[in-house]
From Swiss-Prot:
Chain location of the short sequence motif POU-IV box per the record: 112-121
Main location group: nucleus
Protein name as catalogued: POU domain, class 4, transcription factor 2
Record's subcellular location: Nucleus; Nucleus speckle; Cytoplasm
UniProt induction comment: Up-regulated by the osteoclast differentiation factor TNFSF11. Down-regulated upon neuronal differentiation. Down-regulated in presence of retinoic acid. Down-regulated by dibutyryl cyclic AMP.
GO biological processes: apoptotic process; axon extension; axon guidance; axonogenesis; cellular response to cytokine stimulus; cellular response to estradiol stimulus; cellular response to insulin stimulus; cellular response to oxygen levels
One Pfam family hit: Homeodomain
Compositional bias per record (Basic residues), positions renumbered to this chain: 172-186
Keyword Repressor in record: yes
Gene: Pou4f2
Domain of life, per lineage: Eukaryota
Length: 411
């Protein structure tokens, strides 16, 4: 039973050390205790041999401890001596082991420590972000180094940290290897200089809210961090300045159609009462000296009164026509002549109505002479107290009337 345990322990130990040092250990034990029997040597040396086997794997100290656990002092000294010899032979025969067996574990722990140090540096930089870059309490390349060594799994957790320093933002390319971060430092320094002129809220996926405030979107932080900083600024400025102007346009478009219909009807009635045509209104708008407003066609005014224009055009035309209507009514109340408001309304000749007695006299003159001379027309106009032009036009119209009557009678 003891031999099986010894064999199992020797098989677990190094092969060279077992083959070279088993015999000297047994001879040392036999020389230390000559009176002991041969079968007692394995039983007495079993603790020391086991300790020597352990010393071959773990060091000379283990061999010494195994020797002290023996029942006799001589066997203990022999075990310690054997342990020292096996340690020396192991160092001479075995190749040199690596300097750090747990290198991977140390690198992961170092990366975590550097990540925590980077967060501490960033928190310190919050109080100094208004200083120029040469007054920064830390070197930019150190920040790039620590940020590049952060593993990819920490991107989601670290995206919610409000990093405000430009150099810390420029080092978000954490997917690069540790040995290649020196090649990217000029580009990252350039990004840091550009980001100094931007708001801290533009970084890490900051977006403008509906009320103009800056809100952070951690879910899109890795994607937004790789964007051009100027693109982020343009995007944030578009959100910050586009919303108020859009709301202003919406307030102008939000007009009640019933108000437009009521104004169009009132405008039409007032225009007819003033005796102004639609064409006169369109041409008179240029005289109001409204910026960007010229004369309009008669069809535009007609479509406005009949509500056939588009909603936006109705809204744009309403204040212009309202301004003209106020000026026209003011001129009508004050009995002032403002031809620019009516634009040639007084140039239009009114229809002449001839009374019955003058009409019968003209018909008598026409029966005698259908084509009177110019002197005869002047004498008739002076006799009937009419204008010469009125008498001339009446004779011309009467001749056309006679032609139509003869043509219809001949058919």
């Amino acid at each position: 039973m003891m031999m099986m345990s010894l064999n199992s322990k020797q098989a677990f130990s190094m092969p060279h050390a077992g083959s070279l040092h088993v015999e000297p250990k047994y001879s040392a034990l036999h020389s230390a205790s000559p009176g002991s029997s041969a079968p007692a040597a394995p039983s007495a040396s079993s603790p020391s041999s086991s300790s020597n086997a352990g010393g071959g794997g773990g060091g000379g100290g283990g061999g010494g401890g195994g020797g002290r656990s023996s029942s006799s002092s001589s066997s203990g000294s022999g075990g310690s001596g054997g342990g020292g010899g096996s340690e020396a032979m192991r160092r001479a025969c075995l190749p040199t082991p690596p300097s750090n067996i747990f290198g991977g574990l140390d690198e992961s722990l170092l990366a975590r420590a550097e990540a925590l140090a980077a967060v501490d540096i960033v928190s310190q930089s919050k109080s100094h972000h208004h200083h120029p870059p040469h007054h920064s309490p830390f070197k930019p390349d150190a920040t790039y180094h620590t940020m590049n060594t952060i593993p990819c799994t920490s991107a989601a957790s670290s995206s919610s940290v409000p990093i405000s320093h430009p150099s810390a933002l420029a080092g978000t390319h954490h997917h690069h290897h540790h040995h290649h971060h020196h090649h990217h430092q000029p580009h990252q320094a350039l990004e840091g200089e550009l980001l100094e002129h931007l708001s801290p809220g533009l970084a890490l996926g900051a977006m403008a809210g509906p009320d103009g405030t800056v809100v952070s979107t951690p879910a899109h932080a890795p994607h937004m961090a790789t964007m051009n900083p100027m693109h982020q600024a343009a995007l944030s400025m578009a959100h910050a300045h586009g919303l108020p102007s859009h709301m202003g346009c919406m307030s102008d478009v939000d007009a009640d159609p019933r108000d437009l219909e009521a104004f169009a009807e009132r405008f039409k009635q007032r225009r007819i009462k003033l005796g102004v045509t639609q064409a006169d209104v369109g041409s008179a708008l240029a005289n109001l000296k409204i910026p960007g407003v010229g004369s309009l066609s008669q069809s535009t005014i007609c479509r406005f009164e009949s509500l056939t224009l588009s909603h936006n055009n109705m809204i744009a035309l309403k204040p212009i026509l309202q301004a003209w209507l106020e000026e026209a009514e003011k001129s009508h109340r004050e009995k002032l002549t403002k031809p620019e408001l009516f634009n040639g309304a007084e140039k239009k000749r009114k229809r002449t109505s001839i009374a019955a007695p003058e009409k019968r006299s003209l018909e008598a003159y026409f029966a005698i002479q259908p084509r009177p001379s110019s002197e005869k027309i002047a004498a008739i106009a002076e006799k009937l107290d009419l204008k010469k032009n009125v008498v001339r036009v009446w004779f011309c119209n009467q001749r056309q009337k006679q032609k139509r009557m003869k043509y219809s009678a001949g058919i």
